[in-house]
Swiss-Prot record:
It comes from the Eukaryota. InterPro entries: Costars, Costars_dom, Costars_sf. GO terms for biological process: regulation of actin filament-based process. SMART domains: Costars (SM01283). Belongs to the costars family. Pfam families: Costars. This is Costars family protein ABRACL.
């Protein structure tokens, strides 16, 4: 799969699993994304896809790298709707 395609799939999954935050943007906890069976089947390297999407300014999250367990409560926010 190419990066553009994986980022578009990630957007769909954030919309599916997330909810609107106080700013009206869709967000989801990293732990919810990471532990979702459908996401696990779609993304071979979820963290890599998240980093690519952040570089493209499609999403944002605190920090540079998200790790399972440690960052489960970090919000992944979709910047475009």
């Amino acid at each position: 799969m190419n990066v553009e395609h994986e980022v578009s799939l990630l957007i769909d999954e954030i919309r599916r699993l997330g909810s609107k935050n106080a700013d009206g943007k869709t967000s989801v906890k990293f732990g919810v994304l990471f532990n979702d069976d459908q996401c696990a089947n779609l993304f071979e390297a979820l963290v890599g896809t998240l980093k690519a999407a952040k570089r493209k300014k499609v999403i944002t999250f605190d920090g540079e790298l998200l790790l399972q367990g440690v960052h489960d409560n970090v919000d992944v926010v979709l910047l475009q709707d």
